């Protein structure tokens, strides 16, 4: 499998830490020092489909194909604009495509799960061109009274078009169920014959220390495994992309693997945790900035509710775009992060 095209889209609305100070018992210093986040993008109601479609259109344009050339659409998302039809079906409609389309739910690791799924269809000879999307409106799921969690999240969409090739060198997917570490209850239905849950829905709930320990240890294990499967070490990778969940997690993984900060770009300071969209958003930003060159090895790792994780090694095959968009602050996150 090779990546043939890539694109992304972000909501227009920017919410700063200072805006959160207006209704939360928090401060810019508190948020930045514990998460590395200074601002995030927030979608309007029912905007996910539009942004996912925009990211998809940009990926198709970059790949030089149209929606009619697609054999499948896979969308990694936690919750779309509709319970049904799927976000993938809505994208298919917008692209005037005529192919199978389905959503895939693996929380923040969903994009890597979807990449591996696409690779399997291509290797089986069932598809030539697959659109893989990571799109999230995760802020709509947040409990905006819980300062420990709501400050973390942001919205966005990223997409890639993949086709046959040998670019995906290794993949590792894991699941270790711990529902209490990170979860959100479904809204109770209106069926009068079913018992309502004892615990009312209240947005995302998280045991922060448990998630931190899992994220750091699992990311290190996954990165070492996929690098070894590719016949390399993590330290030999040209780039290491970690799910943009929390700057302290990213820094802990980098320090324990003794990785050069110049090989671990990040955008969490201005996007927040965009769940399944975080890896494709960062990858597209690097591509548009001219940082990705043919032949470079890219290790990617993500983790999320489940608890689940996914990692892979890609050999990049695309030339940089003709028009570049500078992204200097990918290597200059906020300096006041607490260890």
Predicted regions span which residues?
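Claisen-condensing/thiolase-fold acyl-transfer catalytic domains that form or cleave C-C bonds
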Residues: 49, 53-56, 60, 79-80, ...
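Condensing-enzyme catalytic core mediating Claisen C-C bond formation in acyl metabolism
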Residues: 1-45, 146-213, 217, 221, ...
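Short glycine-rich phosphate-binding loop at a beta-alpha junction
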Residues: 68-76, 234-243
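Flexible, glycine-rich active-site loops centered on histidine and acidic residues
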Residues: 123-157
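Short beta-strand segments
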Residues: 7, 76, 105, 130-136, ...
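Anion-binding (especially nucleotide phosphate/pyrophosphate-binding) glycine-rich loop
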Residues: 62, 66-98
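Acidic-glycine-rich active-site phosphate/pyrophosphate-binding loop
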Residues: 24-31, 82-95, 132-138, 189-196, ...
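Conserved small-residue
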Residues: 3-5, 31, 73, 114, ...
């Amino acid at each position: 499998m090779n990546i043939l095209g890539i694109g992304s889209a972000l909501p227009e609305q920017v919410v700063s830490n200072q805006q959160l100070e207006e209704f939360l018992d928090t401060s810019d210093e508190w948020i930045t020092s514990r998460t590395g986040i200074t601002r995030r993008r927030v979608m309007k109601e029912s905007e996910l489909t539009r942004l996912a479609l925009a990211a998809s259109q940009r990926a198709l344009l970059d790949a030089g194909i149209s929606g009619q050339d697609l054999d499948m659409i896979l969308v990694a998302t936690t919750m779309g604009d509709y319970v049904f039809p799927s976000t993938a079906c809505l994208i298919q409609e917008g692209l005037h495509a005529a192919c199978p389309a389905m959503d895939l739910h693996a929380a923040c690791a969903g994009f890597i799960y979807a990449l591996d799924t696409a690779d399997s269809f291509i290797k089986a000879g069932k598809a030539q061109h697959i659109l893989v999307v990571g799109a999230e409106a995760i802020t709509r799921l947040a409990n905006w009274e819980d300062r420990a969690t709501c400050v973390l999240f942001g919205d966005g969409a990223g997409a890639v078009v993949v086709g046959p090739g040998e670019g995906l060198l290794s993949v590792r997917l894991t699941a270790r169920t711990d529902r209490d570490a990170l979860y959100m209850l479904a809204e109770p239905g209106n069926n009068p014959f079913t018992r309502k849950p004892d615990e009312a829905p209240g947005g995302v709930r998280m045991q922060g220390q448990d998630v931190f320990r899992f994220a750091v240890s699992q990311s290190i294990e996954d990165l070492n495994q996929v690098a070894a499967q590719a016949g390399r070490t993590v330290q030999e990778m040209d780039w290491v992309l970690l799910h943009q969940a929390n700057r302290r997690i990213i820094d802990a993984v980098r320090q324990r693997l003794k990785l050069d900060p110049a090989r671990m770009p990040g955008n969490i300071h201005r996007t927040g945790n965009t769940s399944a969209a975080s890896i494709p958003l960062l990858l597209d930003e690097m591509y548009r900035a001219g940082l990705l060159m043919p032949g470079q090895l890219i290790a990617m790792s993500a983790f999320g509710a489940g608890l689940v994780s996914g990692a892979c090694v890609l050999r990049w095959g695309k030339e940089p775009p003709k028009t570049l968009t500078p992204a200097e602050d990918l290597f200059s996150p906020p300096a006041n992060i607490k260890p």
